[in-house]
Amino acid sequence: MDAFEVLALKGTRKVLELLKTKDRMRYSELVSAIGFSTTTSRALKAMVAARLVDREGLDEPYRPVAYSLTEKGRKLSQLAAEIGKL
């Protein structure tokens, strides 16, 4: 799946917008902000596979996971914002 296909998935643009505002966010923070755990999970898996987002396991109890934008993800986020202005 390429970046444009991932961008078309429900929830992807919201995840990009949220991650653009913070260096990294835990999965639970993303779910709380977006409100759709299944949608968020699918979007994140596709974004990690497309190398738009890095997934990092945190060394804490309950093995939480955090996500952050890659350089490619930052560029796509900027492009999506510009397209949204049209």
Give residue spans per PLM region.
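Basic, amphipathic "hinge/linker" alpha-helix immediately C-terminal to the N-terminal HTH DNA-binding motif
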Residues: 59-80
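Glycine-centered, phosphate/nucleic-acid-interacting loop/turn motifs that mediate DNA/RNA or nucleotide
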Residues: 23, 51-52
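Short amphipathic alpha-helical interaction segments
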Residues: 34-49, 55
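N-terminal helix-turn-helix DNA-binding core of bacterial DNA-binding proteins
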Residues: 1-39
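Residues within the helices of the helix-turn-helix
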Residues: 26-28, 45, 65
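Hydrophobic alpha-helical core bundles mediating ligand binding, dimerization, or RNAP-core interactions
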Residues: 4, 77-84
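Amphipathic alpha-helical recognition patches that constitute DNA-binding helices
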Residues: 2, 14, 43, 64, ...
